[in-house]
């Protein structure tokens, strides 16, 4: 008997691509004016090349909240942080932009995909879980 597929059953890369396209098609996420000029962290030298980077980051963040839950802005700053190149000096870890993470979480919250957790951070809502699982089911059916 065939059962429904969840986000855990499909490739993360394929899911993020498909869910980012779904978010872009839905038109519920409104892009801020600064998306074409902002860097994603102080560790980066340039702004993202991909014009759809905001949707991809939102899809990735929704997937991470689905899988782990209880993630807040600080956790996403650590997750998307990386090594800052300091020229001739040794590299060091730097957190990513908190404003980008906060704005995406607020957008996902207005779309009713994530909600505030009483223990701190964000958790996935039932409608958000259903939405993510539907996209995962379409990916599994296509394979």
Curated annotation (Swiss-Prot):
Belongs to the eukaryotic ribosomal protein eS19 family. Keywords: Ribonucleoprotein, Ribosomal protein. It comes from Arabidopsis thaliana. The gene is RPS19C. GO terms for molecular function: mRNA binding; structural constituent of ribosome. GO terms for cellular component: cytosolic ribosome; cytosolic small ribosomal subunit; plant-type vacuole; plastid. GO terms for biological process: translation. This is Small ribosomal subunit protein eS19x. PROSITE patterns: RIBOSOMAL_S19E.
